[in-house]
Amino acid sequence: MFNSQITSQRSSQVSSQSSATGIESALVPMVVEQTAKGERSYDIYSRLLKERVIFLCGQVEDHMANLIIAQLLFLESESPDKDIYLYINSPGGSVTAGMAIYDTMKFIKPNISTVCIGQAASMGAFLLSGGEKGKRYCLPNARVMIHQPLGGFQGQASDFEIHAKEILFIKDKLNKLMAEHTGQTLDKVSQDTDRDNFLSAEAAVEYGLVDSILEQRNDK
């Protein structure tokens, strides 16, 4: 439950994270590169950002969303015609934070290829489905979970109706977008998200949340 935010998350797996994208900064390894000017060190995620790889890991919340958005905008400014690869391992989180990421994905020029590693639950699953069609992937043992937004409110009785209308509006909006991304009917999406709905990688492909399963790199 919460007081002021509508969320969409798998609550049993939410944990607090200290870094921008949900990765513990104290555990981040460093990479040392040799350049013409000598050695240069990067944390591993900054180095992967040079390869246009972004990690969305952990709970979706405002601080993480702002940094994901900043990385998306930076990579667009660097090369607007090159794809960006968004790796997702998330139990979900804030709907507003997730929609900020989603809107930026649609706003910028580069195609966004989404890849589920581990899990993409709730808002994580929504962002997974929002990648460029034909470029949305799951790894073989990844799990995807879709459901309706979770909400709660504490306050005056007269405000309850206002908040109830808002959460129903958001539920309808998310279902319409999910139907658009998956090719399912709105009625089916509404029915399938009424309760927690877990899907294997194969089921996620069949449902239309992703386009294919990545077993290994093509050049391996």
Swiss-Prot record:
GO CC aspect terms: cytoplasm; endopeptidase Clp complex
Origin superkingdom: Bacteria
Keyword vocabulary terms for this entry: Cytoplasm, Hydrolase, Protease, Serine protease
InterPro entries: ClpP (IPR001907), ClpP/crotonase-like_dom_sf (IPR029045), ClpP/TepA (IPR023562), ClpP_His_AS (IPR033135), ClpP_Ser_AS (IPR018215)
Cellular location(s): Cytoplasm
GO MF term (any one): ATPase binding
Reactions it catalyzes: Hydrolysis of proteins to small peptides in the presence of ATP and magnesium. alpha-casein is the usual test substrate. In the absence of ATP, only oligopeptides shorter than five residues are hydrolyzed (such as succinyl-Leu-Tyr-|-NHMec, and Leu-Tyr-Leu-|-Tyr-Trp, in which cleavage of the -Tyr-|-Leu- and -Tyr-|-Trp bonds also occurs)
Main location: cytoplasm
Entries under NCBIfam families matching the protein: clpP, PRK00277.1, PRK12553.1
Similarity section: Belongs to the peptidase S14 family.
Subunit field text: Fourteen ClpP subunits assemble into 2 heptameric rings which stack back to back to give a disk-like structure with a central cavity, resembling the structure of eukaryotic proteasomes.
Protein name as catalogued: ATP-dependent Clp protease proteolytic subunit
Species of the source: Colwellia psychrerythraea (strain 34H / ATCC BAA-681)
